């Protein structure tokens, strides 16, 4: 497997030094950068060892995925722009999590929300296809939103979209907070397109930590048994990037039997 870390481009040298294979950038931030900055990033990614596997945090809160403010026209306009930037940077995937974009008011029609989410994913699938980019739906947890909170719901959603380049992010952090079973991953394992890991420690979303090694071992063995051999990205929002990134890749190498001497 290959390893990535979700962070800003300023930390590219750090990830290179630590031995990460990929950097994963916040799409909603990258999409607004000036052309000169994007060109500079493109040059670094083309010549450097560490590549950009894709975007997390892809959709800003003002772009609704579901709900009263959802707009097909707005979704397509944003998808065109984001996918073009992704194509320039050579990414392979865009994760659609973005909890602020999928909060429903009390009593909202859930079947309608499902229809909106399907349309949103279809739009992104269509706009990303010319660039060879895959779209990954990410299920969340109740502390972040109120729509799309389980792996099984996400799988059913993606199956309805029925596009080869629309798949799932398998996020252990959300599964743990939701207390979901790894057995749920047996439902359409071919839809696992990308993996995120992080650890809830108190109120902080940290990188992966040695104290939880047994659970990580179980998770990675499950992924292997289902035929997944892709990228695992650490998506931590707390702690210092240098410490979280260093500790996480050290543990990932051990878990995957790739520990350097």
Placement of each model-derived feature along the sequence:
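N-terminal substrate-binding region of glycoside hydrolase catalytic domains
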Residues: 14-35, 56-64
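Active-site acidic/histidine proton-transfer and metal-coordination neighborhood
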Residues: 66-167
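Active-site-proximal loop/turn and secondary-structure-junction residues that shape catalytic pockets
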Residues: 9-11, 27-29, 58-61, 100-102, ...
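Short hydrophobic interaction/assembly module
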Residues: 45-72
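Catalytic-core regions built around general acid/base machinery
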Residues: 37-49, 119-128, 184, 218-222
